[in-house]
UniProtKB/Swiss-Prot annotation:
Native organism: Idiomarina loihiensis (strain ATCC BAA-735 / DSM 15497 / L2-TR)
Function: Phosphoribosylformylglycinamidine synthase involved in the purines biosynthetic pathway. Catalyzes the ATP-dependent conversion of formylglycinamide ribonucleotide (FGAR) and glutamine to yield formylglycinamidine ribonucleotide (FGAM) and glutamate.
Family: In the N-terminal section; belongs to the FGAMS family.
GO molecular-function terms, A-Z: ATP binding; metal ion binding; phosphoribosylformylglycinamidine synthase activity
PANTHER family: PHOSPHORIBOSYLFORMYLGLYCINAMIDINE SYNTHASE
Origin superkingdom: Bacteria
Subcellular location: Cytoplasm
Active site: residue positions: C1135 (nucleophile), H1260, E1262
Subunit organization: Monomer.
UniProt-listed InterPro entries: Class_I_gatase-like, FGAR-AT_N, FGAR-AT_PurM_N-like, PurL_large, PurL_linker, PurM-like_C_dom, PurM-like_C_sf, PurM-like_N_sf
Major place of residence: cytoplasm
Protein name: Phosphoribosylformylglycinamidine synthase
HAMAP family the record matches: PurL_1
Length: 1295
């Protein structure tokens, strides 16, 4: 083993934060320093030349002053016995650079602690400095040798039930954490006695996973008796009733990893399999939808818990039918009170928590980063979500009890697209090869399915921790590229059957795969790729290593599939074959035995059906006592309640532009305010058709009325999606995610009532189907504190996600009030018809009350009339703005609309009810619309004709003032400056950003939000974007070839190809593996586009690993050097491609003054819609655009331009090689965050070579080349946005 020191691992502000944390724990640390250490395991000695290459590979990241470490060493390494995802990618890069002597490169962090620390204090410090799930701690650098020790495979064990009987299995149930019910223990004992043998631990574990509540949904399939009366249907049958009543437009329901609904016809854009040139295939683009929960892992370890939640849901989408494509995601969280230090709110009580779970604050600081990071690296935009906090001690039928989300809800969902011929899974032929596609087995996530099925507190802490998985999104991207290549083959798709690997690992996925395909399976344990050789057979077969799929492939199609995997560098292994006999046979060549020999009948047979015998209990509630509440105080409290407060800290961490198909993200208007009701994507780059998704949940209402809570969740998802042009209500399909503390008095019957309200009544009446969903039935946390039994129980929680196809994505409305459209009116559609009920409201919550009567959907016909009329008005373009009424009531709705429009509003309450509190803050169903003077009468007539005359009231108008005013009898009852409420609304996000990110950046952004004079984004062009300057050249007929270049982990190649294709290029898909293998030569290309993403997962520096695999590989270096030296070529590098080109500058003439691009100043991934100004430069791409100012998509974590010295920067500027700069909304060069999202000096964000042929930029023009893909744009822009000009300039140059 050789050891190489790396750069400092913590920036100044992160060092300060870490020091504070240690001091708060009472550990006397005076100084702290951390740096990376690289451990290199060698097959044989490195030559001097190879050692030099290795040293250059291990020099990456921002320049930081060198430091001589002092103090006690705490060395944090990847967990001993594992191979980290970082190591596998870094080792790949080393091998691609010709360093074949290297067996493995691992990385650790050496913390040096100065202070008078005892051995015990050092151990306490180590606990805070590492994550025990994925890391180990060493105290001597040489002990890192343990990382490379190979471990001996462990043997099988069995449970002796032949001698020990039922008691032996009952003991194993506890020690293995199987969560088996009593009747399941009886079932197993009976079946193994029939077989006259003892079960192996692996067989019991496999049975427990396959039959866990998590996988089998026993409660949803149970028989029910309520108050002594037998119920006619199971919960699942009531959900299925929605499909039986309205099967319209559903292509697949209840039987696959996701549901499928009918989409529009459009051109699917992808590289054609025969030529690898991109093109359009016009066909129906059907929509798949899925929403998952990952609650238990997120409570234990939020970052990996939420990351693998998103990763698992993405795999569900990709494994639908015989392969499909995930497209856009959503994330949601429900947690207990945040109790932010220094920002504790008057309604927040701190009830305490068990040590084994993290606090709500830590979940919200870490969990969203995990979910966002997975989506970002995979390349899926996260476009909507929700965030609720609830923790309150209430009077209920059980006496005083605390209700809340100590066991959080972590929602991960999304939509994708699938070909019509691929919706149904095929047959598995006998002899089909059974393949694992994806990463290796690792000893993680054991028992995830069973652990998720227990109330928190029933299992041991070690088992809880073992049940969390860890993520490697770049691996999942590689697998998805293979699946994409398969479905793009159309009728030649080699996939016969596919499932993702989730709960229970292969022990669940492989039996499910073969049994669904009507077959059994014979497997070889030692063929499973395995990064931890010391695992037992149980651990190899049952671990929940992520990023894996199981696939059945006919033998004659295997070679083609293997070639696709090799091109994408996606790991795969053939581990078995399908058999006629319906058994699972697992052989272990190492120990010459068979750990599993079970019929599918026993494994998936008919364990006893559950029966629930429960009683109805519903809290009556008491009237709210708010006589002393001041309206201004109530407004401020509500704006600080996380469910209502600004959520920028949850949004800008997530890429919202990747794919180039995003038509509506969360950020609205020129001021980029996060208030959108709905997420919208385009079907393709050649279409205005699309897809929409929106969420709804009103969980606190369930404490007073289970049915109302469920109806309101459905209704809210519909009032949200109504902002998009859906048309027919029957076109909308719902995912229902049910969470409940099963067994808690009253909750089971309440769940039944809620499912019945939605499945048997509301959805059939609306003509809406619920073809997909998920349940999580163990939402209670129990522990002991100072000898006292404590518990926090979640309300029965239904989270609904509505999906629909969109007729015209240009018609989507936002909450932004328009003050540039002449005289206009604000109109409230009040579906509560003046009842103004406040039970379970946000207002009640912020005063620590519950109330009595909740809002409800009382009249289905009225609701349908509202939806249909609003849709008609959306389609006809008669409305200027739309925002539904939800948490915080009318006050919040109007305030958010004014924030989005950066304007004022004047609202009269006279016709809305007599009680100001109830009128302002009730959360009855409804919406506020803005209507121009000329459309006003037509709009009012449309609602009246629909029978909604008594619901529709003109309430006021937007104003140009910095004031939001609510009046009664023309007297102000509640009034403040918009800036005041905008600032209060931003406080929660500001405090969270300060805790999590660079506090200096958080403060700069907060100050910007307090400015009343912010003019917002602008567009000021020096050219006509509607002019197609490439048209004369396209007419000549011969298209120049552009290599759309990608490396493993790149995810922005489709949109790059689409932009070049539109400009008249022949866009060719080129993987780095094609160049290294000699399949493709850059000699044949006139242009090259290095695309964005996370090549090698940004290991060894963003874009640096990719560049170095070119610099230190003879064939690749030769190809690129020759390409850049030709004077008839052009090259563009965007984001990751920009980082890559800047590291390749020794091969690119005229780039010696280019900077490197390193970690953002905020030290956070930044997804923004930022203003830039095109500079006078030599760039051929930006040639005639100089002086133009316009917004552009930004999505990166390492975009800060770092120059070797000030002279380098001034030389670049003097040579006119700076091509783009960030500017602020006042048109000045941006130095402050977030107008300058990464901290680059003088806003520099694009550079060009001396001759202008090579341009590298961090922002993403290829994602916004269509006007509809811009988060905001001036009304007058046509189909092409101004950024399309770049690509046409390139086409014109090449002639």
């Amino acid at each position: 083993m050789e050891i190489y020191r790396g750069a400092p691992a913590l920036s100044a502000f992160k060092t300060t934060k870490q020091l504070e944390q240690l001091k708060q724990a009472g550990i006397p640390v005076k100084e702290l320093y951390a740096e990376y250490q690289h451990f290199v395991d060698l097959h044989n000695e490195l030559s001097d030349e190879h050692r030099s290459v290795l040293v250059q590979l291990l020099k990456y990241g921002p320049e930081m002053p060198a430091h001589e470490p002092q103090g006690a060493l705490v060395l944090v390494t990847p967990r001993i016995g594992t191979i980290s995802p970082w190591a596998s990618k870094a080792t790949d890069i080393a091998h691609n650079c010709g360093l074949k002597s290297i067996h493995r490169v691992e990385r650790g962090v050496a913390f040096y602690l100065q202070g008078d620390l005892s051995a015990e204090e050092l151990k306490q410090a180590a606990l805070l400095l590492h994550d025990r799930m994925t890391e180990s701690v060493l105290y001597d650098m040489n002990d890192a040798q343990q990382l490379f020790r190979s471990q001996e495979p462990q043997p099988l064990s069995s449970v002796d039930i032949l001698a020990g009987g039922r008691e032996a299995l009952a003991q194993a149930n506890i020690s293995l954490g199987l969560a088996l019910a009593d009747d399941e223990i009886d079932y197993l004992v009976e079946n193994f006695r029939k077989l006259d043998r003892n079960p192996n631990d692996i067989e019991l574990y496999m049975f427990a996973q396959a039959n866990s509540e998590h996988c089998r949904h026993k409660i949803f399939n149970a028989d029910w008796t309520i108050d002594g009366a037998e119920q006619p249907k199971s919960l699942f049958k009531m959900i299925k009733n929605t499909f039986e009543t309205t099967p319209d437009y559903v292509l697949s329901a209840y039987k696959d990893n996701a549901a499928v609904m009918e989409g529009h016809e459009a051109g699917r854009f992808y590289p054609q399999p025969d030529s690898m040139s991109y093109g359009y295939s016009h066909e129906p683009v059907h929509i798949l939808m899925k929403v998952e929960t990952h609650n238990h892992p997120t409570a234990i370890s939020p970052y990996p818990g939420a990351a693998t939640g998103s990763g698992g849901e993405i795999r569900d989408e990709g494994a639908t039918g015989v392969g499909s494509k995930p497209k856009a995601g959503l994330v949601g969280f429900s947690v207990s009170n945040l109790n932010i230090p220094g920002f504790k709110q008057p309604w927040e009580e701190n009830y305490g928590k068990p040590a084994r779970i993290v606090s709500a604050l830590d979940i919200m600081l870490e969990g969203p980063l995990g979910g966002a990071a997975f989506n970002n690296e995979f390349g899926r935009p996260a476009l909507t979500g929700y965030f609720r906090t609830y923790e309150q001690t209430v009077d209920s039928h059980n006496g005083r009890e605390t209700r809340g989300y100590h066991k959080p809800i972590m929602i991960a969902g999304g939509l994708g697209n699938i070909r019509e011929a691929h919706v149904q899974k095929g047959d598995i032929p006998v002899g089909a090869k059974l393949v694992v596609l994806g990463g290796p087995a690792m000893n993680i996530g054991l028992g995830g399915g069973a652990a998720s099925s227990m109330a928190s507190g029933e299992s041991t802490e070690d088992l809880d921790f073992a049940s969390v998985q860890r993520e490697n999104p770049e691996m999942e991207r590689r697998c998805q590229e293979v699946i994409d290549r398969c479905w793009q083959l159309g009728a030649d798709n080699p996939i016969a059957f596919i499932h993702d690997v989730g709960a229970g690992g292969l022990s669940n996925a492989m039996p499910e795969l073969v049994s669904d395909g009507g077959r059994g399976g014979r497997f070889e344990l030692r063929e499973i790729p395995n990064d931890e050789p010391g695992m037992t057979p149980l651990e190899i077969w049952c671990n929940e290593s992520q990023e894996r799929y199981v696939i059945a492939i006919a033998p004659e199609n295997l070679a083609r599939f293997e070639a696709l995997c090799e091109r994408e560098r996606a790991e795969y292994a053939v581990i078995g074959e399908a058999t006629e006999e319906l058994t699972i046979l697992l052989n272990d060549a190492k120990f010459s035995n068979q750990p599993i020999d079970l019929s599918l009948d026993v494994l998936l047979g008919k364990p006893p059906k559950m029966h629930r015998d429960v009683a109805r209990l519903q809290t009556e509630g008491t009237p709210l006592h708010l006589e002393a509440a001041d309206l201004n105080d109530a407004a401020d409290r509500l704006l600080r309640l996380p469910a209502i407060a600004e959520k920028t800290f949850l949004i800008t961490i997530g890429d919202r532009s990747v794919t180039g198909l995003v038509a509506r993200d969360q950020m609205v208007g020129p001021w980029q305010i996060p208030v959108a009701d709905v997420a919208v994507t385009a079907s393709s780059y050649d279409s205005y058709h699309g897809e929409a998704m929106a969420m709804g949940e009103r969980t606190p209402l369930a404490l007073l009325n289970f049915g109302a809570s469920a109806r309101m969740a459905v209704a809210e998802s519909l009032t949200n999606i109504a902002a998009a042009d859906i048309g027919d209500l029957k076109r909308i399909k719902l995912s229902a995610n049910w969470m409940c503390a099963a067994g808690h008095p009253g909750e089971d019957a309440g769940l039944y009532e809620a499912v019945k309200a939605v499945g048997e009544e509301l959805c059939p009446e609306l003509g809406i189907t619920i073809p997909v969903g998920k349940d999580s039935m163990s939402m209670k946390t129990q522990w002991q504190q100072d000898g006292e039994d404590k518990a926090v129980t979640a309300p029965m929680s239904l989270v609904i996600t509505a999906f629909g196809r969109v007729n015209d994505i240009r018609s989507t409305l936002t909450p932004q009030l328009r003050t540039d459209k002449g005289q206009s009116h604000l109109v409230l559609i009040d579906l509560g018809k003046g009842q103004n009920r406040l039970g379970g409201s946000a207002l009640a919550q912020v005063y620590q009350q519950l109330g009595q009567h909740t809002p409800d959907l009382d009249d289905t016909e009225t609701f349908k009339a509202f939806f249909n009329t609003t849709q008609q008005l959306v389609t006809e373009g008669r409305l200027l703005a739309y925002h539904d009424r939800s948490d915080g009531g009318l006050f919040t709705t109007v305030a958010e609309m004014a924030f989005a429009g950066n304007c004022g509003a004047k609202v009269a309450l006279d016709e809305l009810g007599e009680d100001n509190l109830a009128t302002l803050f009730n959360e009855e169903l409804g919406a506020v619309i803005q209507v121009s003077d000329e459309q006003y009468q037509k709009v009012m007539d449309a609602y009246k004709t629909a029978g909604l005359g008594d619901c529709v009231k003109r309430i006021g108008e937007p104003t140009h003032e910095d004031a939001i005013v609510f009046t009664r009898d023309e007297q102000n009852v509640l009034a403040q400056s918009r800036t005041h409420w905008r600032t209060v609304w931003a406080e929660t996000t500001h405090h969270m950003q300060r805790l999590r990110d660079n506090p200096v950046c958080a403060d700069e952004e907060f100050r910007l939000k307090q400015r009343a004079d912010n003019p917002g984004l602008l567009a000021d062009l020096t050219f006509d974007p509607s002019e197609d300057i490439a048209a004369p050249y396209i007419a000549k007929g011969v298209a120049p070839k552009v290599a759309i270049l990608r490396e493993q982990g790149v995810n922005s190649h489709y949109e790059m190809a689409a932009a070049f294709d539109r400009a008249g290029f022949e866009a060719v898909d080129v993987h780095m593996s094609d160049i290294l293998a000699g399949r493709v030569s850059l000699e044949d290309m006139q242009a090259l586009a290095a695309c964005g993403g996370f090549s090698y997962g940004d290991v060894l520096g963003a874009g640096e690993g990719w560049a170095k695999s070119i610099l230190f590989n003879d064939r690749a270096r030769e190809q690129f050097e020759a390409f850049f030296k030709r004077n008839d070529t052009l090259a563009l590098g965007v984001c990751n491609g920009c980082q890559m080109l800047s590291t390749l500058k020794q091969l690119i003439p005229g780039t010696e003054h280019w900077p490197r691009f390193v970690t953002n100043r905020s030290e956070r991934f930044e997804a923004r819609f930022s203003l830039v100004e095109v500079q006078e430069s030599k760039s051929i791409f930006l040639g005639d655009m100089a002086g133009s100012r316009m917004p552009i998509a930004v999505s990166h974590g390492e975009g800060r331009a770092e120059f070797a010295n000030p002279q380098q920067q001034s030389q670049l500027e003097q040579n006119s090689q700076v091509a783009l700069r960030y500017i602020d909304n006042w048109g000045e060069v941006a130095e402050q965050y977030p107008a300058n999202p990464n901290g680059s000096p003088k806003g520099i964000t694009a550079v060009t070579s001396d001759d202008g042929r090579v341009t590298a930029m961090m922002p993403h023009p290829e994602r916004v080349f269509r006007t509809v893909a811009n988060s905001w744009h001036p009304d007058e822009w046509g189909e092409d946005s101004p950024w399309m000009r770049m690509f046409r300039n390139a086409r014109k140059h090449l002639g």
